[in-house]
């Protein structure tokens, strides 16, 4: 049986701290480029799960790059998004890896923001040259009708997360998600084992498919433990306008506060902690809070936020693989792929 390589194993080999190795592998924190490269090389050499099969370090990449599968006049991969993606969003790490992978195939990436008017009128961004576009990757495109319009273009298409798909016809495109259920249920289990009985959810479950899956995982978990009282104190205001205010107003109306909240993502969790503080509650002394994404802010927020880590590097590699194989074999059945996530326990749940 093959022994699983851990971050600690890599740290021991290099005589570095586990924290330093973790920063390099998860692309968080500040490290010297030479240190980061040394760690990643060792991780690949030892067969660490995230890098064991990835061509991270090719000598003379220009010479060893694979031949392009794209025609010379159609070499662009277009990224469409409705939001400005910050460096703390998991997509930042993911896109770095995605772009690195497609560059090996002599392809380039262009980024196009869908304006509110274009979204409403179901129009492509004016900056997009469809004649030069070999494929499209979508981030934060959660309007179902707009997504259907993109599918009708009959171009290779990948959604990273998607509109809520519950009770809707499937999109004619590949879809990539982070694993949303297992670690949410592990977080609820951790709370129950530590004596929490009234556990609620915070976040708009209809914002996107991932939020919906996280809510359903939470609900299944509390029903499994017979702790359904928390369902009545879920904080799920919809829409994005003045969300912190809406969240505050929602929990302000609660006659009984939960013992703990599971949140749709870290930014909902941080808004929730601030709202609870304004109402006189302390996290974690009075109420526990768990986020999702393991954003950079989670580790230096006060209190440090328990969260669920998304592996941006492996998502970027998987995204490139899905889109390029779709370009090469357009007749493939549509694929839905999930990548691993991990629960990270910190101060906001008493850890």
Identify what each model region corresponds to.
Residues 89-105, 183-186, 209-229, 271, ...:
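Short, solvent-exposed amphipathic alpha-helices that sit
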Residues 174-202, 241-249, 269, 310-328:
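Hydrophobic alpha-helical segments within soluble ligand-binding/sensing domains
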Residues 102-115, 201, 219-244:
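Short beta-strand elements in bilobed, periplasmic/extracellular small-molecule ligand-binding domains
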Residues 248-351:
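Flexible loop/turn connectors
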Residues 185-227, 335-350:
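An alpha-beta-alpha
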Residues 139-183, 267, 293-305:
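Flexible loop/hinge segments that line or gate small-molecule binding clefts
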Residues 48-124:
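Amphipathic helical "hinge" segments at domain boundaries
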Residues 1-65:
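N-terminal helix-turn-helix DNA-binding module of bacterial transcription factors
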């Amino acid at each position: 049986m093959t022994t699983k390589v851990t971050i600690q194993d890599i740290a021991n080999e290099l005589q570095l701290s586990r924290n330093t190795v973790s920063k390099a592998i998860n692309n968080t924190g500040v490290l010297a480029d030479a240190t980061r490269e040394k760690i990643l090389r060792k991780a690949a050499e030892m067969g660490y799960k995230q890098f064991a099969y990835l061509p991270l370090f090719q000598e003379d990449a220009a010479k060893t790059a694979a031949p392009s599968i794209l025609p010379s006049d159609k070499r662009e991969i277009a990224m469409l998004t409705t939001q400005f993606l910050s460096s703390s969003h998991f997509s930042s790490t993911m896109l770095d890896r995605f772009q690195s992978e497609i560059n090996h195939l002599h392809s380039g990436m262009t980024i196009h923001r869908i304006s509110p008017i274009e979204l409403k009128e179901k129009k492509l961004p004016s900056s997009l040259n469809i004649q030069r576009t070999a494929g499209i990757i979508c981030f934060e495109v959660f309007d179902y009708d707009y997504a259907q319009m993109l599918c009708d273009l009959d171009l290779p298409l990948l959604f990273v997360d998607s509109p809520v798909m519950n009770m809707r016809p499937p999109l004619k495109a590949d879809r990539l998600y982070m694993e949303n259920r297992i670690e949410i249920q592990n977080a609820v289990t951790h709370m129950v084992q530590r004596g929490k009985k009234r556990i609620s959810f915070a976040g708009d479950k209809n914002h996107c498919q991932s939020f919906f899956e996280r809510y359903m995982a939470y609900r299944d978990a509390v029903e499994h433990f017979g702790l359904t009282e928390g369902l009545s104190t879920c904080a799920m205001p919809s829409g994005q306008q003045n969300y912190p205010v809406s969240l505050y107003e929602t929990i302000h109306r609660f006659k009984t506060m939960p013992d703990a909240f599971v949140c749709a993502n870290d930014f909902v969790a941080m808004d929730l902690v601030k709202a609870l503080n304004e109402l006189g509650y302390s996290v974690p002394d009075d109420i526990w809070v768990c986020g999702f994404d393991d954003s950079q802010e989670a580790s230096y927020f006060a209190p440090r936020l328990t969260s669920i880590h998304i592996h941006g590097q492996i998502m970027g590699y998987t995204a490139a693989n899905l889109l390029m194989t779709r370009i090469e074999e357009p007749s493939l059945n549509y694929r839905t792929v999930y990548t691993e996530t991990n629960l990270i326990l910190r101060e906001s749940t008493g850890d």
